[in-house]
Amino acid sequence: MMWQRAQGLREINDSQQEGGLLLCADALETDLSAYLGQVQMIYLDLPGATGQDYSCKLRVGEKGWETSRQAINLPAYSDYVKPDDQQYLHDLRRMLDLSHALLTDSGSLFLHVEANTLARARLLMDEVFGENNFKNQIIWTYQAGGRSKKHFSRKHDVILFYAKSTAHFFDITQVPVTRKEERSNHLKRHVDEHGRSYRSIKTGGKEYIYYDDEPVYPDDVWADVALLQQKDPQRTGYPGQKPQALMDRMLLSTTKPGDLVADLACGSGSLLMSAANNQRHFLGIDKSPVAFAVSRKRLAPYRLVCQAPFSDHGAMLDASSVPGIGYYTVGINSYIVPEEDLVGFETQPKGLPIRGLDLVDQWCAGLMNKGVFVAYASSVRQKQTPVLQTQLEVPLLRGTVSILLIDVLGRRTLWTATPVM
């Protein structure tokens, strides 16, 4: 049976695991007044100033997720033209002003910047947050990347860390790191009366003792967090994705369980995942429909409120809904997209035909009530689950059985078998 389109105000992903709010919107054009002074930590990794366009390499179908040999490139975002671009500086200043207003008095901001924008970003941060609230210029160094003969190869990123005020909350004991063994080479080793091993050194008339079992904490050079490798299960294909370990260190040191954190250009949703995994609430915003789709997929196991426009295109969905004992069994049979919709997209391999349910990246089944779609079950394609489930169960509750589907082009549609009253 062919289903028809429906419209909704928002989507709620029903789950027992606490999550947060995900918006497909421009943070600078969104009313966030309800969150003023409520956010404990903000992470920003904004478009840079290289003049480049970036695409998301999304795997397609069961074979694509199993072997990575089938994919489609989707436009993700574009950088500003150059570092002194007035639009870049204007938008960065507005984003910093918004972040300052959203933060609690004890809150923190981490701004991820590139080498060619660092100086200007630091000056703007000093203007908005105050020089006295500067905490660290964190160097995240890594070994991956290319080599250059025109200059020293760039092997680090910079993260500017600022507090909102002197009431700043910071707890480094939440982020211990592995002790560096090479530090002990020039120290004498001992064992105390309790059997604890330690090393010592005398200098300046004083003896310094370091117990082997004492925790150690990171400084402002982070060399122990690697870039995501090509086969890392975290990898989504979204450009610029950062590893969870990087997000965890910033989040755990500046927030407590139950706090609200935000990413106003959330991209692949790494900070949001860190928040959900560590019992923090999150607010994620990105104006890219592709970023929204990638983040939504990663956050599918968590309770999630989504607000994003629905696409209006010529696709058709063949689906079914069969009532049973306590549940509807909802199934998708086929999804048809006009061939012209796929024209112009680069695929791997070149000319890859994408048809049928290979066009579906994720879908969920649920009930519609008064414009609100509540998803009770979902299936998403990812490395761990390359095969799309074609049947899901929805409880026999009040509401109209509906399907929310996101295809491989990042287009989000809502469907129902009967008109929504």
Tell where the protein language model's regions lie, with residue ranges.
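SAM-dependent methyltransferase catalytic-core segment centered on the flexible catalytic loop
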Residues: 31, 37-108, 172-201, 277
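Short glycine/proline-rich turn/loop motifs
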Residues: 72-82, 225-236
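Accessory, often C-terminal, charged low-complexity segments
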Residues: 1-10, 19, 28, 36-40, ...
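Conserved class I S-adenosyl-L-methionine
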Residues: 258-265
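Conserved SAM-binding loop and adjacent beta-strand
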Residues: 232-246
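Glycine-rich SAM-binding Motif I of class I
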Residues: 269-273
